[in-house]
Amino acid sequence: MGGSTRDPGALEGAGILGQSPYERLSQRMLDISGDRGVLKDIIREGTGDTVTPDASVLVKYSGYLEHMDKPFDSNCFRKTPRLMKLGEDITLWGMELGLLSMRKGELARFLFKPAYAYGTLGCPPLIPPNATVLFEIELIDFLDSAESDKFCALSAEQQEQFPLQKVLKVAATEREFGNYLFRQNRFCDAKVRYKRALLLLHRRLATCEEQHLVEPAVLLVLLNLSFVYLKLDRPAMALRYGEQALLIDKRNAKALFRCGQACLLLTEYERARDFLVRAQKEQPCNHDINNELKKLSSHYRDYVDREREMCHRMFAPCGSRSSVGGN
């Protein structure tokens, strides 16, 4: 959240005598549970639609006990928070209800009564019995996975009955999941999502009129697969998907670059140079492409030097070789 917005001093400021800080705070909060068990105060408005049931959410949060300045629970120290699925990964009922009221980019403060948090027993020794807790939650993003999960569970014949726009939407969701997992360095999991997206797009037989909608979606997934296989140190597979991307767009700089990277790892230096020079022609000022060409040049020089040394040893005069059985 880029630093807590909670101000303990403000919560404990002047108010009705005998009321606790959380009681005073609750008076200006919105009841979203219907029984004042979950109260909400929006700190920063979000945009777009509210979170859908069964969505997977990317959030930053911090939980506080009353009269405590430091959070008892927080994920704000993580560079990339974990993607959490509603109904599975979130244990607090109050947090789940709160998230369903939020929009992308929103930052809000919630009060959860015991029935929506840790119950009458609490969670010793951290959470005392009957504790009302305050959570600050920032909704970074969310992905509606319910539609994708249901669609992927259908047979190929059932999927064929849906219009193309539905298939494109589900494939895009799978790709977005893959991108998120990729950013978390979970490359194997990302690969699975990308392959699901590609299978959906290939399974749907597009008409000639629809092809212009399908090909761009397929191209993006192929580029993702090529990149993720490079990260998995499987250059042959990276080259395979990169070349498939070039069948769709033979001048695509990313595809040419990925193929060049793969060939370099496979020590196919001539092919690597061909791909990278073509990529450079499309994007002359691309630093990654230019640096890869320098890297190729260095590797090739080392390769030539090793070959020259090996040939020198193979064809050196017999007299210049050390005698194995010498005195």
Swiss-Prot record:
**What is the recorded phenotype of mutating residue 254 to A?**
Abolishes interaction with HSP90
Keywords annotated in UniProt? Chromosome, Cytoplasm, Differentiation, Meiosis, Nucleus, Repeat, RNA-mediated gene silencing, Spermatogenesis, TPR repeat
Q: Which GO terms describe its cellular component?
A: cytoplasm; cytosol; fibrillar center; intercellular bridge; microtubule cytoskeleton; nucleoplasm; synaptonemal complex
- SMART domains found in the cross-reference section: TPR (SM00028)
Quaternary organization: Interacts with HSP72/HSPA2 and CLTC. Interacts with GAPDH; leading to inhibit GAPDH catalytic activity. Interacts (via TPR repeats) with HSP90.
Q: Where are the transmembrane segments?
A: none
Q: Which PANTHER family does the annotation name?
A: INACTIVE PEPTIDYL-PROLYL CIS-TRANS ISOMERASE FKBP6
Q: Mind telling me which InterPro entries this protein's record contains?
A: FKBP6/shu (IPR042282), PPIase_dom_sf (IPR046357), PPIase_FKBP_dom (IPR001179), TPR-like_helical_dom_sf (IPR011990), TPR_rpt (IPR019734)
Q: What does this protein do?
A: Co-chaperone required during spermatogenesis to repress transposable elements and prevent their mobilization, which is essential for the germline integrity. Acts via the piRNA metabolic process, which mediates the repression of transposable elements during meiosis by forming complexes composed of piRNAs and Piwi proteins and govern the methylation and subsequent repression of transposons. Acts as a co-chaperone via its interaction with HSP90 and is required for the piRNA amplification process, the secondary piRNA biogenesis.
Task: Give the family from UniProt.
Answer: Belongs to the FKBP6 family.
Q: Where are the TPR repeats?
A: 171-204, 219-252, 253-286
**Protein name from the UniProt record:** Inactive peptidyl-prolyl cis-trans isomerase FKBP6
Which source organism does the UniProt entry give?
Mus musculus (Mouse)
Q: Which GO terms describe its biological process?
A: cell differentiation; meiotic cell cycle; piRNA processing; positive regulation of viral genome replication; protein folding; regulatory ncRNA-mediated gene silencing; spermatogenesis; transposable element silencing by piRNA-mediated DNA methylation
GO terms assigned for molecular function: Hsp90 protein binding; identical protein binding
Subcellular location per the Swiss-Prot or TrEMBL entry? Cytoplasm, Cytosol; Nucleus; Chromosome
Free-text tissue specificity from the UniProt record: Testis-specific.
Classification via PROSITE patterns: FKBP_PPIASE (PS50059), TPR_REGION (PS50293)
Quote the disruption phenotype from the UniProt entry. Males mice are sterile and aspermic due to abnormal pachytene spermatocytes, characterized by the appearance of unusual inclusion bodies and dense compacted nuclei. Spermatocytes fail to proceed beyond the pachytene stage due to abnormal pairing and misalignments between homologous chromosomes, non-homologous partner switches and autosynapsis of X chromosome cores in meiotic spermatocytes. No other abnormalities are detected in any tissues of males. Females mice are fertile.
In what residue span(s) does the PPIase FKBP-type domain sit? 54-143
